[in-house]
Amino acid sequence: MEKGIIFRISRPYKVYRTAMAPKIVVPGVKGDLTVLVDRAPTLVQLRDGLVQVLDKADKVTERYFIKGGIADIARNRCAISTEKVVAYENTDVEKDTAKRDAAIYDEDKAYYQMIIDYLTTFGNKEK
C-alpha cells in the first residue's frame, strides 16, 4: 500500500472533507507549510488562506479557502480545524463580493476579500 497523508478539514461540529494525499500545503501564520509523509509531529496556527492538496507530481488537485484555525500534524495525518471553509470550485467573485458586503464583522469581510483577491488575481482558469 502506498503511503500518503490522511487529511481532514473540519469546522465546529462538522467534518467538511476527509481524504488521502501525498502532500498538503497549509497557510501557517509564519508562512506556508508543506506537509509530507513521515513529517515530524507539529501543531501549526493557521491564517486565513488557501489549503492545497497536491498529487505525486506536485499538481494541485483540490483547494480550500479557510478562515484561520490550527493544523495538528502527526503520524501521516493532518487535521485542520477552522472556523470557515469553502471549496475553490464553489467560489465566485460576484457571490463572494455580495457575502463580503453583507458581512457584519470585519474579520468576515477580510475573509471574503481574500477570496475575491485570489480569484481576481488568478482568475477562474485554475478551477
Region spans (language model):
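N-terminal export/targeting signal detector
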Residues: 1-6, 105
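Compact, glycine-rich, soluble single-domain proteins
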Residues: 6-99
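Acidic/glycine-rich phosphate/pyrophosphate-binding loops and surrounding catalytic core
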Residues: 85-127
